[in-house]
From Swiss-Prot:
PANTHER family: 4,4'-DIAPONEUROSPORENE OXYGENASE, PHYTOENE DESATURASE
Subunit structure: Composed of a catalytic GlpA/B dimer and of membrane bound GlpC.
Superkingdom assignment: Bacteria
Catalytic activity line of the entry: a quinone + sn-glycerol 3-phosphate = dihydroxyacetone phosphate + a quinol
Official protein name in the record: Anaerobic glycerol-3-phosphate dehydrogenase subunit B
Gene3D superfamilies noted in UniProt: FAD/NAD(P)-binding domain
GO biological process, one term: glycerol catabolic process
């Protein structure tokens, strides 16, 4: 099976890279082993919230020079040696909008998103259904009704309301009861956001839901709900807003995250619409190399039939997605045994303080400035690495996980397009 480009991994980075390549007419295949981290996403995407020294960042693009001094191995720092990162960021934003996603935010300045705990976190882009506020301004609401769903344990309205009250907002907490959910509620293991959304999205349940929300929010100017409506798109929520006559925003729940799934579905639909091929439930097990080039990939489902392409992209994720594997005494990349940025002594991999930055989160594949992975200190000619498999950054402490995924995806796609044009 022959393609122009094969991408290993179907998460945010892999899909974004595939979309950009397919938009330029490249025939791409994505080998995806299963659920990716987007299913755990809040629906907001971070670009850069903190520098490695802990300094807060309000304008991400203005902080890149300081980041390069503090973290020269950071993917942003490497990409800045080759191109303008602001151009990659702008293209990433445009790519998401071409996928039909309604997003708010800008790289010029971070904004605040409301978390399921009622606190605020800085971020870059958010789905339009998520409650957001200016970075340095007051929260834009005075009276808020936080409404959970009776029997739904993955969202606690009292916790959100209490945190909002601490910020000077008149917030109330209540639970709605909808008879349409009673049968689902009888099985707690099935009473999850996705299954609830399938019921709440039905047109026949809209008016009863609107009546219940109106009853519980009579004095509120805005309603906060758990993200349990609008499974595929926001149209059911828009229709509910029209009936209730008030703004209704969604807060993420425990996984699986409906907002993250909506992101994934939009990206995957765009990729397939452009002619890309997704191989779900498959995994690349090994690679065939001649000199310093990959000539074939062998996957679990295709056995001895090699997958061939002129260019390969490694977007296999970090430990969560098995793109990196940890044994008792080492970290390794399982397909090609690529060079890894890590620490030699296991005792140094983590800190006893759970809330301190954890060193292992910065472990990942080592690359050159073109994001070509190193193997024995030498860059492979036709392989690039993108997203969470890369080393040199802490996506949690620095608040840059989605930004690295999207910018590295666009960066590598543009390099591949240029290289293939020269080859032709």
């Amino acid at each position: 099976m022959k393609f122009d480009v094969i991408i290993i991994g179907g998460g945010l980075a892999g899909l974004a890279c595939g979309i950009r390549l397919a938009e330029q007419g490249k025939y791409c295949a994505i080998v995806s082993s299963g659920q990716n981290a987007l299913h755990f996403s809040s629906g907001s995407l971070d670009l850069l919230a903190k520098l490695p020294d802990g300094q807060a960042v309000s304008q991400p693009l203005s902080a890149l020079s300081a980041l390069a001094e503090l973290a020269p191995e950071h993917p942003y720092s490497k990409m800045r040696n080759i191109t303008q990162l602001d151009e990659l960021v702008q293209e990433a934003e445009a790519l998401l909008r071409r996928c039909g996603l309604d997003i708010v935010g800008s790289s010029a300045e971070n904004h605040l998103r409301l978390t399921p705990l009622g606190s605020c976190r800085p971020t870059w882009l958010s789905l339009a259904d998520i409650p957001v506020a200016p970075l340095n301004g007051p929260l834009p609401w005075q009276r808020v009704a936080v409404i959970g769903i009776e029997g739904f344990l993955d969202f606690q309205p009292q916790m959100v309301a209490s945190a909002l009250q601490d910020q000077g907002i008149d917030a109330t907490a209540d639970y709605l009861h909808l008879p349409a959910l009673d049968r689902l509620r009888d099985n707690p293991s099935e009473f999850r956001a996705v299954n609830i959304a399938r019921i709440l999205d039905l047109p026949e349940n809209r008016q009863p839901l609107a009546d219940e929300l109106s009853r519980l929010s009579s004095t509120a100017e805005m309603i906060l709900l758990p993200a349990c409506i609008g499974l595929d798109k926001s149209a059911p929520l828009d229709a509910l807003r029209a009936v209730v006559g008030k703004p209704i925003q969604l807060l993420p729940t425990l996984p699986p995250s409906l907002l993250g799934m909506r992101l994934h579905q939009a990206l995957r639909h765009r990729f397939q619409q452009l002619g890309g091929l997704v191989m779900p439930g498959d995994a690349v097990l090994r690679a065939e190399l001649v000199d310093n080039r990959i000539t074939g990939l062998y996957s679990r489902n295709h056995g001895d039939i090699p997958l061939r392409a002129a260019q390969m992209v490694l977007a296999s994720g970090s430990f969560f997605s098995n793109g990196l594997v940890a044994t008792f005494d080492k970290i390794y990349e399982p397909i090609l045994d690529l060079d890894i940025l890590s620490l030699p002594h296991r005792a140094d991999w983590s800190h006893s303080n759970l809330f301190a930055p954890q060193p292992y989160l910065q472990f990942g594949v080592n690359t050159d400035n073109h994001l070509r992975p190193l193997r024995g200190g030498v860059a492979l000619e036709n392989l690039h690495a993108i997203g969470a498999v890369l080393g040199g950054y802490d996506p949690l402490q620095q608040g840059c996980g989605a930004g690295v995924s999207l910018t590295s995806a666009v960066f590598v796609a543009e390099q591949i397009i240029s290289e293939m044009a020269v080859t032709l």
